[in-house]
Structure formats: structure tokens, C-alpha cells
């Protein structure tokens, strides 16, 4: 697809160099708590991350390809599975009213999803790219779909403060 000829400059995104760097990635406490068999409270989890050298005040510009998301409003694996089944996720009440056997199956398959790409705000020169109020864009994919390169099966989510 080509861009329209009359596209105003304010609606374009400049070319920005990207550098890749291998980093360790850890799940959020909520994701760890939901999908781990270990019994752990927030303080213990936070202490362990600190021992591993994880900075709780991560850099605001933290794009990721794979790994675990730096969530703002909570883990999204359950949301991905719900939406893939056509369930509404606009409020907590919808999930609470889902039958228990369906919730159990959703929770069983939520772990099939993984972060594909996380995009955070960018400030370069005079250019600023923001998503809501300091938000991030998240693209999730099922592990099997990634292996099969089915990128049309991606789930997108925006979280912001």
C-alpha cells in the first residue's frame, strides 16, 4: 500500500534507527502469579527481581521483540484468549459472568499466548510518538501461530496510565 500523496507531515512517522540488544525478561507479578505453581507474594517477588538486578523503574523507552511485556494495567494473556473466543473484555463483569468451565479452559489456554512485540513511546529530536498517557502497544501471538508464521493471528492491545 502506498501512502496518500496529500498526507500532511504531522501524520507521518520518520525513519528511526533501531538497535537490538539481548536482555533478560521477567514476567510481571500478576502473570507469574496466574501461570506459576509457586506460592509467592508481591514483596517476595519484588525482592527476588531486585536480587537479579532488575530495575523496578524501567526505562520509559523499552521496545521488545519477544520476552515478557512490561505491563501497565495488568497481564494480557487471559485477555488474548478471551478475545480469540469472541468474549467481550471491556469490563471485569463480563469475565466474572463467564461460566466456570469456560473460565477454566480460558486459563488453561491463556499460556499458549506470548508477547511478539512491545512498542513504547519514542522521543527523537523534535519527534514524539506517544500512545495515550505514556502507554505502550502490545502485539501477542499464540506460540503455535508464531512457529507457523501466522502473523494474521496477532492480538493487539494498548495499555496506558
Predicted regions and their residues:
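Preference for intrinsically disordered or flexible, low-complexity segments
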Residues: 1-161
